[in-house]
């Protein structure tokens, strides 16, 4: 007889006896020999043991919920092992010439020279898995060379990092340049890199960035600034206003802040009459009023049904802006000159404006911009990002309160693609990421460039 368990033998004998007592006439069952009965018994024991084991396991989970157990997992790779890696980074410094020198109130008060060009700092990033991203920062007048130089100093820290770990990379770049702080050129050098990483992230997902962020809308109401600068004669301003409306713009912003405040009122009156009573109109003083002038001009401008009065005071005068916002019915907008999340935090928590106007390239990229958006939304502020509509369209589309987008055609020659303006709104395209690629003209305007890693395209 084979070596079988005692339990199997006893169980087999029990079955054998029970069957003979219950069915004495079933001779065919009696012909099963003892070994076969024992195998049957062992099979029953095996099945029963597994059932009891499962029940016991369930009972132990219930009865011993304070006990710990650790599953042994094999053959599974971690995210760190399978993640993508940054293999190549290119930085470029280009200078975009302006056809006509631009003057606002800062020029007329002698604080700045007319603007003749815009420095553009570009980051192009490629990953091991073949994904690419493009981002940019900028500077008007001085600063472009410094932003590019600092970006060049810290860019090699990107190599080998997973491009999806945007927050980790941002922190690493901040610490690489910790000696120069966390605002101003220090973060403006990170901006093109951070924007490029978000562009890559959305491209990888196969989505426009607005959709990746969770868009609240597919288009954003849009206003024009470039037609209303102080260097532009009033008759040309009125022609620009008419052309903008014909092109589908949703609002007009007029520059103010001249030493002769009566001239501001004269130009504003003419533009309001040309637009009609209800067409959206804004004014921008570019920080050129003191508190007394700001309240006096603000009261005079109440009659013009303005969407907002922008930068009536120095950008860092949080208290003065708060007093003005509380005193006027016309909303106050400010924030474009601030260069960090912390500065915007002071503005928002200080109730200094009705509209916040962060600029992603200036505050350090999309990552800090999203934090500003979140804080502003929690405090009920409206959003009107400054400049860089190619980036801000996506961010504004993801803001919970209806925002405004600033239309500036200056950067159009840099990109192969253009944004659609229709029915007073700028529309998010179905192109993945930010939805733009660099033009040959952008390459021709490039004066400096550097590369890190190896391009494997």
What spans do the regions from the language model cover?
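Flexible C-terminal active-site loop/helix
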Residues: 61-72, 81-89, 96-101, 114-115, ...
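Active-site mouth loops of central-metabolism enzymes
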Residues: 221-236, 286
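Positively charged N-terminal leader segments that act as targeting/secretion signals
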Residues: 2, 6-8, 12-13, 34-35
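Conserved, mostly hydrophobic/aromatic
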Residues: 130, 193, 206, 284, ...
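Metal- or metallocofactor-binding catalytic centers and their adjacent structured scaffolds
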Residues: 73, 88-92, 125-204
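Catalytic core of soluble alpha/beta enzymes
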Residues: 254-386
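Alpha/beta enzyme core
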Residues: 238-247, 297-303
């Amino acid at each position: 007889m084979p070596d079988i368990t005692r339990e199997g033998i006893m169980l087999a004998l029990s079955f054998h006896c029970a069957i003979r007592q219950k069915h004495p006439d079933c001779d065919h069952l009696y012909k099963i020999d003892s070994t076969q009965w024992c195998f049957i018994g062992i099979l029953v024991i095996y099945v029963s043991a597994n059932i009891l084991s499962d029940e016991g396991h369930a009972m132990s989970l219930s009865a011993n919920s304070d006990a710990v157990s650790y599953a042994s997992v094999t053959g599974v790779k971690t995210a760190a092992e399978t993640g993508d890696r940054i293999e190549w980074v290119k930085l470029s410094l280009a200078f975009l010439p302006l056809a006509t020198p631009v003057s606002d109130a800062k020029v007329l008060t002698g604080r700045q020279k007319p603007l003749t060009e815009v420095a553009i700092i570009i980051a192009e990033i490629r990953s091991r898995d073949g994904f690419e991203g493009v981002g940019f920062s900028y500077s008007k007048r001085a600063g472009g060379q410094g932003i590019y130089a600092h970006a060049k100093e810290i860019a090699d820290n990107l190599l080998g990092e997973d491009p999806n770990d945007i927050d980790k990379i941002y922190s690493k770049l901040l610490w690489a340049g910790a000696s120069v702080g966390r605002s101003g050129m220090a973060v403006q050098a990170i901006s093109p890199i951070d924007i490029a990483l978000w562009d890559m992230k959305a491209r990888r997902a196969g989505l426009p960035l607005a959709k990746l962020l969770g868009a609240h809308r597919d288009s954003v109401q849009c206003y024009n600034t470039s037609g209303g600068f102080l260097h532009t004669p009033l008759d040309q301003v009125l022609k620009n206003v008419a052309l903008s409306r014909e092109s589908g713009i949703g609002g007009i912003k007029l520059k103010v802040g001249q030493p002769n405040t009566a001239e501001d009122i004269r130009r504003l009156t003419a533009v309001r009459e040309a637009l009609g009573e209800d067409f959206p109109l804004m004014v921008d003083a570019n920080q050129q009023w003191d508190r007394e002038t700001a309240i006096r001009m603000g009261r005079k401008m109440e009659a013009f049904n303005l969407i907002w009065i922008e930068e009536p005071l120095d950008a860092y005068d949080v208290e003065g802006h708060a007093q003005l916002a509380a005193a006027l019915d016309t909303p106050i907008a400010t924030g474009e000159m601030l260069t960090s999340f912390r500065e915007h935090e002071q503005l928002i928590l200080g109730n200094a404006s009705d509209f916040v106007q962060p600029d992603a390239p200036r505050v350090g990229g999309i990552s800090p911009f999203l934090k500003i958006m979140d804080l502003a939304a929690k405090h009920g502020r409206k959003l009107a990002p400054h400049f860089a509509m190619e980036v801000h369209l996506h961010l504004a589309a993801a803001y919970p309160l209806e925002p405004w987008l600033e239309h500036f055609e200056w950067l159009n020659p840099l990109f192969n693609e253009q944004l659609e303006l229709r029915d007073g709104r700028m529309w998010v395209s179905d192109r993945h990421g930010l939805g733009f690629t660099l033009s040959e003209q952008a390459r021709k305007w490039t004066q400096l460039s550097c590369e890190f890693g190896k391009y494997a395209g």
